[in-house]
Design a protein with these regions (language model features):
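Conserved, mostly hydrophobic/aromatic
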Residues: 7, 15, 36, 117, ...
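Active-site beta->alpha loop and helix N-cap motifs at the rims of alpha/beta catalytic domains
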Residues: 43, 47-179, 199-202
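Terminal or standalone catalytic/regulatory effector modules within metabolic enzymes
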Residues: 35-55, 336-551, 555
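Phosphate/diphosphate-binding loops
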Residues: 276-292
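Glycine-rich phosphate-binding active-site loops on the catalytic face of alpha/beta enzymes
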Residues: 117-120, 196, 242-261
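N-terminal amphipathic alpha-helix/helix-capping segment at the start of soluble metabolic enzymes
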Residues: 1-19, 67-72
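C-terminal helical cap(s) of enzyme catalytic domains, especially alpha/beta-barrels
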Residues: 255-277
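Catalytic cores of alpha/beta
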Residues: 161, 179, 229-244
Length: 558
């Protein structure tokens, strides 16, 4: 077990994205920054994910300003981190190497220290370019292996077994994840992250996986998870006991629930084990003072009401309640003895005492991401077909296996979920399966997202796409976004520099109106600044008044 544990703080990116729809304004971020400089986190995740899109779409702010302002405030005390989807970067389409290189260079020049790179299919080919360019410009390549689980197949009847029918063999074994990590390390990864976006990894699994990864690669291992199904805190405790190098946490008011575990609960556990986090908890307490108010502001602006919050707690000044102390001791003992059932019960009891959200049992039992489930519900509600939700859920394993068993992470989780709903609707209407297909599902089966963990049956691909051969996305067909001149802004270009061009390429639907509005305002301000002031105009008019009256022809007095 390591005696030093590094902390990556997620509060300003994943934390606000998971709990507050990524609506934290620049002004709110800046209220926390003086204290972040003193906190000495190993890393701070502040960019990527939904942040660049949301700050333009909802806040009318500049994504590059967000990154650069945090760098200016924090300096080199903590490494700033962003989340990138491999060849898709922050967008959803595969980009050319020219765009990937420009994006990596500008990100690092603007203050980024670590790029966390993942691919929704765990297709290593999709992350090669980003790794190369991040390292070329002096950044740290944090390569993530997306954790996912095998489908829950229906139980076979005795008759099925007699006939020799078998469910598919497991694909997402520990060896699968270790193999991916070794491939990434060979490409130049500087660290490996177990990225559990859905919070589905239980403590016993992460304990085994951390040990195997530590034995297989010589670079640091990070663990990222969420608390939605209730495993998060216990799994972080198990990973720490297994010797993980870095864990991802949120500050108290943004911790738990759909987010990552609260740092303070990790701190209490590590205190018992004599593990140093290298974090100034006094500065963290000051961050939390700001975040408490910001949490309330976001609840009002985003949800229209204050949501239940955990009890206030500062481990430096508040006595640890006796009930929590007992559960912490139980958790430490259980983690050391690998009694994972007891560890899970103790961790959940600690969170319950402080009032963090209870585990989402539906997500836990279905073993699918919470966002995937909620999107399926929304799709069926829009169609007034909520009655087929159970059947849609039953079809997920079938649809997923047919499509090559993609990991259930963004965007493949949404693609599989939407297609399962389509299949259930087809079935209800008496149509054959896959009569209704969404374009993203067709592209996934065709191969445009990359190689799936399991090969797609060529006949199924022909049924869905009209071709039997796997066909990857043709980067040579990529067309850059138009960059017109704006007459309403004095004829300037929509994107005037490389950073603006990158925003336009990655987020065309959002960046176009954002940049147009930005240029119009700048032009209007320039026009207003150069226009004569009203008082000057009046004075000039007064001077130019014609002289009237009778002219006297007489010498002036001496």
């Amino acid at each position: 077990m390591a005696k030093v544990l590094k902390i990556r703080d997620l509060t300003l990116r994943d934390g606000q994205q998971s709990s507050f729809a990524t609506r934290m304004t620049q002004a709110q971020v800046e209220r926390c920054l003086p204290f972040y400089k003193d906190a000495h986190f190993f890393a701070m995740e502040v960019w990527g994910g939904a942040v660049p899109d949301s700050v333009m779409r909802y806040l009318n702010e500049n994504p590059w300003t967000r990154l650069e302002s945090i760098k200016a405030a924090v300096g080199d005390v903590s490494k700033l981190t962003a989340l990138s989807r491999g060849r898709n970067l922050f967008g959803y389409a595969p980009y050319t190497d020219e765009i990937i290189e420009g994006f990596c260079r500008n990100s690092i020049e603007s203050g980024l220290g670590i790029m966390r790179i993942f691919d929704c299919l765990n297709d290593v080919d999709n992350v090669k370019s980003t790794i190369k360019y991040v390292k070329k410009y002096g950044g740290i390549a944090d390569c993530a292996v997306c954790y996912t689980v095998d489908p829950k197949y229906p139980k076979l009847s005795l008759w099925d077994k007699i006939k020799g029918k078998k469910n598919p063999a497991p694909v997402f074994t520990d060896d699968y994840f270790v193999s991916k990590a070794k491939e990434l390390a060979a490409l130049g990864a500087d660290m490996i992250t177990i990225k559990d976006m859905s919070g589905l990894i239980p403590p016993q699994r992460v304990s085994a996986l951390v040990k195997k990864l530590k034995a297989a690669v010589s670079i640091p291992v990070d663990f990222h998870t969420h608390c939605t199904p209730g495993y998060g805190l216990a799994s972080v405790y198990a990973a720490i006991a297994a010797g993980v190098d870095v864990v991802d946490t949120n500050c108290w008011w943004f911790g738990g629930g759909t987010g990552a575990p609260a740092l303070e609960l990790v701190y209490l556990f590590c205190q018992k084990l004599g593990i140093d986090l290298g974090v100034n908890m006094e500065a963290v307490a000051k961050i939390n003072e700001s975040l408490k108010d910001i949490r309330s502001e976001l609840n009002t602006s985003v949800f229209g009401a204050d949501k239940p919050a955990p009890k206030p707690f500062n481990p430096l000044v508040d006595a640890v309640p006796a009930e929590v102390e007992a559960e912490l001791n139980r958790a430490v003992k259980a983690a050391q003895s690998e009694d994972f059932a007891t560890l899970l019960a103790a961790a959940q009891a600690i969170e319950a005492y402080f009032g963090f959200p209870a585990p989402n049992k539906l997500v836990q039992e279905a073993e699918i991401p919470g966002g995937m489930y909620s999107n399926m519900v929304a799709q069926l509600q829009a169609l007034k077909a909520e009655d087929i939700l159970p059947r849609s859920m039953e079809l997920i394993p079938t649809v997923r296996l047919s499509a090559g068993l993609p990991p259930l992470v963004t965007p493949t989780s949404q693609i599989v979920g939407a297609q399962a709903v389509n299949c259930a609707l087809d079935e209800k209407a008496g149509r054959p399966m896959y009569h209704t297909k969404n374009n993203q599902f067709v592209n996934l089966v065709k191969g445009e997202y990359g190689k799936t963990p399991v090969a797609v049956d060529p006949e199924f691909r022909f049924q869905i796409c009209g071709v039997r051969e796997e066909t990857n996305y043709d980067i040579s067909k990529y067309q850059q976004q138009p960059n017109p001149e704006l007459p309403e802004a004095g004829g300037v270009k929509l994107a005037e520099n490389e950073k603006e061009v990158l925003l336009l390429e990655l987020f065309p639907l959002v960046a176009k109106p954002y940049l147009t509005n930005l240029k119009k305002k700048a032009y209007e301000a320039t026009v207003a600044a150069t226009a004569p002031k009203a008082e000057d105009t009046a004075a000039a008019a007064e001077v130019k008044q014609p002289i009237t009256g009778k002219t006297v022809l007489a010498p002036l007095p001496g």
